[in-house]
Amino acid sequence: MSGFVEKPEPIQVPGLVHLHTGKVRELYRNEAGDLVMVASDRISAYDWVLPTEIPDKGRVLTQLSLWWFDQLADLAPNHVLSTELPPGAPADWEGRALVCKSLRMVPVECVARGYLTGSGLAEYDETRTVCGLALPEGLVDGSELPAPIFTPATKAEVGEHDENVSYEEVARQVGADTAAALRQATLAVYSRARDIARERGIVLADTKFEFGFDGDDLVLADEVLTPDSSRFWPADRWQPGRAQPSYDKQFVRDWLTSAESGWDRKSEQPPPPLPQQVVDATRAKYVEAYELLTGQSWS
C-alpha cells in the first residue's frame, strides 16, 4: 500500500477547473484552455506522500525551475506562459503557480544520468547495464560515467514506482523519431545544466525531464532541475564508493528508516508525521540548493 497519507482537498478557484492532484502539484485548466500548475509544500518518500509539509518547498521548486528555464531557453522551448497569479487565486499561490501551455505530453520520464547511483546502480550491480546500455566494469556508487546516458522510465501514478525501460521500448511506444528527439533533448539539456551546476560547486548526478508537443515542437514541461527531480551533490564532498551527501530529501528518508520513527517500510502502514528538526533541515537543504545554483538569496 502507498499513496497519500492524507489526500488534500483541492482549492476551488472561480474560472479554474481542477484536473489532477499529484504528489506535489495541483493542476487546473483556465477558461482560455491553458494549464495552471501549483506547487504545494508536500513531500513524498518511499512512494508515500507524507502528512507533514516542508515550508516554502513549492516556491523553491517553482522559482528554481523558472531560473533553469531561462538558462536553457536557447536549447529547449518550455511550457511557461505567465507567472501572474490567476484572478481569484489565493495569495498563498504567489510564487508557486505557473500558467502553462497545454501540451500533448509524451508518456515517458526522460532521465539523464552522468553518475551511477540509485536504481541505476542496483541494475548495474546485477547486469553491468542500465536500461540495456552496457557500462564498464569497476563502477561503484557515485562513479562518474564515461558519458551521460539516457535512461527512460515509465510514468507511474501516485503511490506507484516509475519503471526503467530500454530505449528500444520507448521507440516502440512513441515512435523512432520521437524517441530520438527525446534522447537528444534530454542529453543536451542535462549536459548544459551539469556544466552550470559544476561552476557553482554542485555535481548534477542525474535528473528527470518531461516533454510534450506543441504542434510539432518538442517542449520542456513540468519542473526542471530541482531537488525533487534531480540528485545534487556538493562537489567538494564527492567521493565514489559511498552514498553521497545531497541537496534533497535525504533527511526525510533517513529519519523514516531510523529506529526513532518507529515505522516499518515493509509494512502497509502509512509513515508518521515528521519531527520539526527534520522539517527544518530539509527546508534548509532546498533553500541552499536554490541559493548555490542561482547565486540569489532566498530571503
Swiss-Prot record:
Q: Which InterPro entries match?
A: SAICAR_synt/ADE2_N (IPR028923), SAICAR_synth (IPR001636), SAICAR_synthetase_CS (IPR018236)
Q: Which CDD domains match?
A: SAICAR_synt_Sc
Root EC class:
ligase
Molecular function (GO) terms for this protein are: ATP binding; phosphoribosylaminoimidazolesuccinocarboxamide synthase activity
Q: Which UniProt keywords apply?
A: ATP-binding, Ligase, Nucleotide-binding, Purine biosynthesis
Record bears the keyword ATP-binding: yes
Does the record carry Transmembrane as a key word? no
Q: Which pathway is it part of?
A: Purine metabolism; IMP biosynthesis via de novo pathway; 5-amino-1-(5-phospho-D-ribosyl)imidazole-4-carboxamide from 5-amino-1-(5-phospho-D-ribosyl)imidazole-4-carboxylate: step 1/2
- One Pfam entry name: SAICAR_synt
What SUPFAM superfamilies does the record tag this protein with? SAICAR synthase-like
Q: Catalysed reaction per UniProt?
A: 5-amino-1-(5-phospho-D-ribosyl)imidazole-4-carboxylate + L-aspartate + ATP = (2S)-2-[5-amino-1-(5-phospho-beta-D-ribosyl)imidazole-4-carboxamido]succinate + ADP + phosphate + 2 H(+)
EC code: 6.3.2.6
Listed under GO biological process in this entry are: 'de novo' IMP biosynthetic process
Coiled coil (UniProt feature) = none
Family indicated by similarity: Belongs to the SAICAR synthetase family.
Checking PANTHER family in the record gives: PHOSPHORIBOSYLAMINOIMIDAZOLE-SUCCINOCARBOXAMIDE SYNTHASE (PTHR43700:SF1)
Q: Which NCBIfam families match?
A: PRK13961.1, purC
What is the protein's name according to its record? Phosphoribosylaminoimidazole-succinocarboxamide synthase
